[in-house]
Amino acid sequence: MTHPLHIAVLMGGWSSEREVSLTSGNGVADALESLGHKVTRIDMDRDVALRLAEAKPDVVFNALHGTPGEDGTVQGMMDLMGLTYTHSGLTTSVIAIDKELTKQQLVPHGIRMPEGIIVESESLHAGDPMPRPYVLKPVNEGSSVGVAIIKERDNHGVPIHRDSHGPWQTFATLLAEPFIRGRELTVAVLGNRALGVTELVPSSGFYDYEAKYTDGLTTHICPADVPADIAEAAMRMALDAHRLLGCKGTSRSDFRWDDERGEAGLYLLEVNTQPGMTPLSLVPEQARHVGLTYADLVQAIVDEALAGKAAR
């Protein structure tokens, strides 16, 4: 760092990931203050544009998760205001938050992703959209919010009962994908570098929202105990996805790996352009593995945002 900056940290908001965002944002703000920066913490509300205009920051650190901080809405607002901000821009955010648009962007370039179909939630009560087991997920939510695995003879019924609890009660449309057996892997990318591969072993068997953000519910194995060619393939796919989508700052790519099929069993599930920065989050964990402190990581994200401004 050459000189202290005034940095607004945007956090909170009203998405289903509000609490995670507040934890991420306050952690980021504490780190920036420890580095000597002036920090304005903004818990985003409907008056966010006014508050940013009043703050006049050198750069905005976007620590929001979910809508509207991850879907291009806030990015478009900050573009109109002429603000410099961290992480991905408008177009990338619009594409990456939508799992189907992400597939359309990445699969033609050889990145393996599960085939899926968009289904009307109402239709699920008449019959399954594909053979079980399969996964139902919202098209544009993160942190495994609203994800359900539909198994043979499970307690959702055959077909899914109308009164059975699941994402079909909340979302009008869902993405249905074949369930991929195997192991959960994730790769963080910082700038132009894939940091490593972590395996996630949730105690419940499914890496859902609670498992992600509750201490002790998921074991993180970093680096993952996988063959070198699988680790290299996952990091290559994550870096390719980061570049093809036009991600900035940091991203996190989530994978399923069927370890009975070798590299052919490695599937990219989604790319998160606003990955968590909480004490349990995966990007800070992988950064530590390669020798970066939490403060180093935060500063690197800010530096890339400023470098992007200078290049324009």
Swiss-Prot record:
UniProt-annotated binding residues for Mg(2+) 2: E270, N272
Annotated residues for binding of ATP: 130-186
Pathway annotation: Cell wall biogenesis; peptidoglycan biosynthesis
ATP-grasp domain sequence ranges: 103-303
Key words, A-Z: ATP-binding, Cell shape, Cell wall biogenesis/degradation, Cytoplasm, Ligase, Magnesium, Manganese, Metal-binding, Nucleotide-binding, Peptidoglycan synthesis
InterPro entries assigned to the protein according to its UniProt record, in alphabetical order: ATP-grasp, ATP_grasp_subdomain_1, D-Ala_lig_Van_CS, D_ala_D_ala, Dala_Dala_lig_C, Dala_Dala_lig_N, PreATP-grasp_dom_sf
UniProt GO MF annotations: ATP binding; D-alanine-D-alanine ligase activity; metal ion binding
Required co-factors: Mg(2+); Mn(2+)
Cofactor note: Binds 2 magnesium or manganese ions per subunit.
GO CC annotation: cytoplasm
Compartment(s): Cytoplasm
Enzyme Commission designation: 6.3.2.4
Coiled-coil segments on the chain, per record: none
Residues where Mg(2+) 1 binds: D254, E270
One GO process term, biological-process aspect: regulation of cell shape
UniProt catalytic activity: 2 D-alanine + ATP = D-alanyl-D-alanine + ADP + phosphate + H(+)
Keyword Nucleotide-binding in record: yes
NCBIfam families: D_ala_D_alaTIGR (TIGR01205), PRK01372.1 (NF002378)
Family: Belongs to the D-alanine--D-alanine ligase family.
Function: Cell wall formation.
Designated name of the protein: D-alanine--D-alanine ligase
Source organism of the structure: Rhizorhabdus wittichii (strain DSM 6014 / CCUG 31198 / JCM 15750 / NBRC 105917 / EY 4224 / RW1) (Sphingomonas wittichii)
Name of encoding gene: ddl
